[in-house]
């Protein structure tokens, strides 16, 4: 019930202050609330919300649970998934410890370096990890970054993407994950330091060092370059997990050169020319190989966890097409269902799609492009027609560039009626 004094003056139903004592009085059905009580309620709700976030972080899934969820989205890469699950679990366990400097032991951050061929699942793994832990996630492309003062993006813009992903909640952003892709493209052009300035290579590596290790960075709220007269967002990167990834084309020859036996003289063994696949070579990677490739020692030192991904074979690509929760075939079947059409893809067609992706050396990333190309004309036609019952992707659609097989409702219905009659007779 609304509250009045003797002079019929309006009062807040919660604190009893009169209309003259507050800035604003908001009316409801027979009740009033002042701006001060609204602010107090907001503070109480925010405190409860912050506590719930802390509780969520304390309920961190175990490495085996993280891997089980990764298995639902990412096919193969068993060792990589285990290594990532352990690294992410340890990182957030470190954050959850109330006093990380208890005693003489300081728990330091372990950022992750992921190496693997194009389309092997680096980005998908990082995205899925962020979903599992329920933290803000941002992807940045290392090729667009340049050293401060040059044309291109400053490294602080990476942090802005994370802040935006957290809806400008700085506290949440400070516990997020940033994935920096194409990090191999910022390798310096030669192993020896150059006299000329390498603003998109070594310069970017130098600029990334501080935020990788942990610092309070000043981020321009609108992005772009910094200038002296603007306000900055302050963000502490100490608890942000950085995952950097790249294909590192050519590093296999560096590893092969280091691991192959060499000797001289008449009794010398001939240099072993054992041909190993890319995945097997990457498993033998050492920090010295990364230095030879063009990463600077300080940068390598800030990425203690190295995870290698294998090249996806035909069987793995077929599984990627059919098995994950968001598998490509499931996505297209759903798209066709919306238009009232059933989609079927023959086993041999799936195998040929996988082979084509291997030939193009695009890995899992190239699968969508191949499938899209096969079905483009059919998907263009279906919404304009209501007589199509089923579309079948055959092997000929891939090998001979034929159109997928279309079954009309008038052809399918008589067969179904005949089958039902036979079953009823028997």
UniProtKB/Swiss-Prot annotation:
Recorded superkingdom: Bacteria
Keyword field contains Transferase: no
Entry-linked SUPFAM superfamilies: Glucocorticoid receptor-like (DNA-binding domain), P-loop containing nucleoside triphosphate hydrolases
GO molecular function, one term: unfolded protein binding
One record GO biological process: cell division
PROSITE patterns per the UniProt record, alphabetical: CLPX_ZB (PS51902)
Domain ClpX-type ZB intervals: 1-53
Record: residues binding ATP: 117-124
A GO term from the CC aspect: HslUV protease complex
UniProt-listed CDD domains: RecA-like_ClpX
Positions annotated to bind Zn(2+): 12, 15, 34, 37
Pfam families referenced in this protein's UniProt entry, alphabetically: AAA_2, ClpB_D2-small, zf-C4_ClpX
Keywords assigned: ATP-binding, Chaperone, Metal-binding, Nucleotide-binding, Zinc
ATP-binding keyword on record: yes
Family, as annotated: Belongs to the ClpX chaperone family.
Subunit structure: Component of the ClpX-ClpP complex. Forms a hexameric ring that, in the presence of ATP, binds to fourteen ClpP subunits assembled into a disk-like structure with a central cavity, resembling the structure of eukaryotic proteasomes.
Main function: ATP-dependent specificity component of the Clp protease. It directs the protease to specific substrates. Can perform chaperone functions in the absence of ClpP.
Name of the protein: ATP-dependent Clp protease ATP-binding subunit ClpX
């Amino acid at each position: 019930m609304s509250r009045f004094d003797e002079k019929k003056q309006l009062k807040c139903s919660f604190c009893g202050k009169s209309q003259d004592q507050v800035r604003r009085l908001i009316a409801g059905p027979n009740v009033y609330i002042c701006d001060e009580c609204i602010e107090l309620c907001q503070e109480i709700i925010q405190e409860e919300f912050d506590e719930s976030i802390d509780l969520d972080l304390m309920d961190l899934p175990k490495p085996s649970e993280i891997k089980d969820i990764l298995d639902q989205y990412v096919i193969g890469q068993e060792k990589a998934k285990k290594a990532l699950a352990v690294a992410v679990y340890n990182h957030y366990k470190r954050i959850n410890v109330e006093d990380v400097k208890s005693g003489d032991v300081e728990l330091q951050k372990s950022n992750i370096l992921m190496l693997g061929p194009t389309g092997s699942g680096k980005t998908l793994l990082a995205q899925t990890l962020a979903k599992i832990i329920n933290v803000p996630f941002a992807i940045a492309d290392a090729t667009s970054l340049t050293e401060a003062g040059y044309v291109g993006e400053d490294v602080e813009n990476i942090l802005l993407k994370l802040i935006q992903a957290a809806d400008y909640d700085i506290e949440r952003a400070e516990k997020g994950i940033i994935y920096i892709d194409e990090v191999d493209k910022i390798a310096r052009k030669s192993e020896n330091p150059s006299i000329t300035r390498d603003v998109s290579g070594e310069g970017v590596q130098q600029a990334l060092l501080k935020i990788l290790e942990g610092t309070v960075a000043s981020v321009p709220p609108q992005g772009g370059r910094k200038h002296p007269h603007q306000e900055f967002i302050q963000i502490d990167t100490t608890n942000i997990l950085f995952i950097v990834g790249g294909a590192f084309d050519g590093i296999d020859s560096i590893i092969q050169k280091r691991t192959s036996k060499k000797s001289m003289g008449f009794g010398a063994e001939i240099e072993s020319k054992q041909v190993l696949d890319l995945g097997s070579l990457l498993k033998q990677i050492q920090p010295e190989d990364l230095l030879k490739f063009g990463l600077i020692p300080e940068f390598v030192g800030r990425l203690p966890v190295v995870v290698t991904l294998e090249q996806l074979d035909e069987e793995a690509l077929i599984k990627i097409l059919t098995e994950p929760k968001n598998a490509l075939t499931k996505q297209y079947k759903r798209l066709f269902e919306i238009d009232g059409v059933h989609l079927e893809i023959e086993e041999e067609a799936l195998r040929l799609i996988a082979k084509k992706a291997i030939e193009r050396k695009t890995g899992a990333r190239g699968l969508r492009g191949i499938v899209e190309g096969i079905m483009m004309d059919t998907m263009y036609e279906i919404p304009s027609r209501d007589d199509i019952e089923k579309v079948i992707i055959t092997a000929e659609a891939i090998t001979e560039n034929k159109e997928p097989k279309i079954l009309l409702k008038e052809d399918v219905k008589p067969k179904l009626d005949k089958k039902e009659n036979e079953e009823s007779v028997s």
